[in-house]
């Protein structure tokens, strides 16, 4: 995780893909519901 602004949320994995991050900022979804298991391990 390079930058804090890339986090999906306070309790979310910061290695989530960009689509998940933008969805979270737009309140359209979260890492848990959008994409699971891809970028969980850092």
UniProtKB/Swiss-Prot annotation:
A single Gene Ontology CC annotation of this entry is: extracellular region
What subcellular compartments does it reside in? Answer: Secreted
Origin superkingdom: Eukaryota
Please give the Pfam families that the UniProt record associates with this protein. Answer: Atracotoxin (PF05353)
Molecular function, one GO term = sodium channel inhibitor activity
Fill in the domain comment: The presence of a 'disulfide through disulfide knot' structurally defines this protein as a knottin.
What protein name is recorded for this chain?
Delta-hexatoxin-Ar1a
């Amino acid at each position: 995780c390079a930058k804090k602004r890339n986090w999906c949320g306070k309790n979310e994995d910061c290695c989530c893909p960009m689509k998940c991050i933008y969805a979270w900022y737009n309140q359209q979804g979260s890492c848990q519901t959008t994409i699971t298991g891809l970028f969980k391990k850092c």
